[in-house]
Amino acid sequence: MVSHQFLPYLDYIKICLASPERIRVWAQRILPNGQIVGEVTKPETINYRTLKPEMDGLFCERIFGPIKNWECHCGKYKRIKDKGIICERCGVEVTESKVRRHRMGYIELSAPVVHIWYLKGMPSYISVFLDMAAKEIEQVVYFNTYIITHSTAENKQIKYKQLLTEDEWVLIEDQIYRNEIQGEIEIGIGASAILKMLKDLDLSLESDLLRTKLVNLKAVKKDKIMKRLRIIDNFMVTGASPSWMVLNVIPVISPDLRPMVQLDGGRFATSDLNDLYRRVINRNNRLKRLEEILAPEIIIRNEKRMLQEAVDALIDNGRRGRVVVGANNRALKSLSNIIEGKQGRFRQNLLGKRVDYSGRSVIVVGPDLKLNECGIPKEMAIELFQPFLIHQIIKEGLANNMKSAKKLMQKHTSVTIELLQKIIKWHPVLLNRAPTLHRLGIQAFDPVLVDGRAIRLHPLVCPAFNADFDGDQMAVHIPLSIEAQTEARLLMLAPNNFLSPATGQPIITPSQDMVLGCYYLTNNNLANQKGSGHYFSSFEDAIIAYKQKLISLHAFIWVKFYGTINNLDIGRFIKSTLCKNKLTTTDYYENLQVKKDIEGTITCQFIKTSVGRIFFNIAISGNLFFSTSNHNK
């Protein structure tokens, strides 16, 4: 864990391979008597009689800390005044029990094992480093074939990294014994052979050789070499060694992250990780005993393979071979299962955790809202803006303390709503819809109080959130500080996010029923409509006539227009007439009638339109010029 005093000096956090020495440093502590603790050597968890953790076991208090605050294992020290003392009898440090959430242990393996992520992952890093097929390496790791790890033999049939069966190796041994093969040959099997080959790699030399090969190669082979070169360069930059992909030490995570809980009736419920760690420790201890008693090689190899499989199950259960199951044939959750996926530690508990001053509800359409507004239910707003509301109630003198202010607030009186209206007037809120795949997945809006329990959303911002109104839910967050509110208003307000950051194209565009409505209003309906051909002195007169049902929505009418007409398709010229007084002329076009005086000055003009198009023009006036043509998307 990072101490808070160092946080201001951090530039970044890097995740990389850990060396065996680093893993030991995480867990090892030196007691005043010189004893080094940290290694977990026993598979036991708790003593069934005393219900206390077993020493050197998976819940050991000496390694991970006391289970009770300020109390050691043997009970000699039980007070906070003994803080920091390490008990002479049991070796447990007198401290808070919360240290069991971050103190780690480790298991020292009797034989190296390959990390399954780097063997079975995509790409397989070990196969890329050794320039071998992943299946070939798998055969070696699980003790099915031998591999030549070093060769100076002149025989061309014997090459470095060549795979050998048991019979082939016996034949080569006979040839070496009879001096038919000159030079040294070393073979290996299991993870130890892979470890030796990775240690023998010179990364800088390999990098130089690959760069030399790239000069005169075809595209297909070049891609393969580039892939290998990129991984080698990344290891060199981070200072990681390829041999760290083979584990000699396994970290044991803190016991409070894999708890054991006592149920009613005396039974215990435990994390699956404890079972997986227990399998590793049992097999590791058994391998150690077999090596001590000089057991036959075939038995030791079988135990090493079982240890490899136990570590595989601990890291990623089911990635290779049979899934390790517990009670009721349920697959045990490994470290990978805990952190991956939607229900994993990152997405469920870190990115998706619940925070204060936030709410969640179903969204419904709010067509009467402005683009920068969203509808927040009154019940939700009172709860979310509670600190601001309590402060305002006390400031207005409606209550003397927080307790009475809370009581007044919970009554939802008209006074409370008025104060809330005043508070939210300049206080933006953040709306977020999961999954937040790009930055427009969370935007700021000015809240508007609405009845009901649903959040109202402007239909034009739906494409940015990829939202629809078939039951989608959205989260509301309240920026508390002035800095957060300012940033939300300047950078995150919906009208300020008009363009998609990915393509640069407008993302606030009308769609679906909005386009259909625009088409319906501006449609050329050729059928006989009520009131067609009537003349009106203004748009308002035409709307009044429509409301009185004197004309239909799509009837073509002539409306007097005083402004400048731009971008109007006036259609073909029909005729020009001279009035009886011979002082004015009228030019008739398909969509326009223009009256001019004797000097040619326009005195009056009528445009051909419909009430639907007038409504459409009013809706978009100030942004677009009036047009009588259909407005398709």
UniProtKB/Swiss-Prot annotation:
Its EC number is 2.7.7.6. GO terms for cellular component: chloroplast; DNA-directed RNA polymerase complex; mitochondrion. Its main location: plastid. Keywords: Chloroplast, DNA-directed RNA polymerase, Magnesium, Metal-binding, Nucleotidyltransferase, Plastid, Transcription, Transferase, Zinc. GO terms for molecular function: DNA binding; DNA-directed RNA polymerase activity; magnesium ion binding; zinc ion binding. Transmembrane segments: none annotated. Its cofactor is Mg(2+); Zn(2+). SUPFAM superfamilies: beta and beta-prime subunits of DNA dependent RNA-polymerase (SSF64484). Zn(2+) binds at C72, C74, C87, C90. Pfam families: RNA_pol_Rpb1_1 (PF04997), RNA_pol_Rpb1_2 (PF00623), RNA_pol_Rpb1_3 (PF04983). SMART domains: RPOLA_N (SM00663). The keyword Nucleotidyltransferase applies. It is an enzyme of class 2 (transferase). HAMAP family: RNApol_bact_RpoC1. In plastids the minimal PEP RNA polymerase catalytic core is composed of four subunits: alpha, beta, beta', and beta''. When a (nuclear-encoded) sigma factor is associated with the core the holoenzyme is formed, which can initiate transcription. This is DNA-directed RNA polymerase subunit beta'. The lineage of its organism: Eukaryota, Rhodophyta, Bangiophyceae, Cyanidiales, Cyanidiaceae.
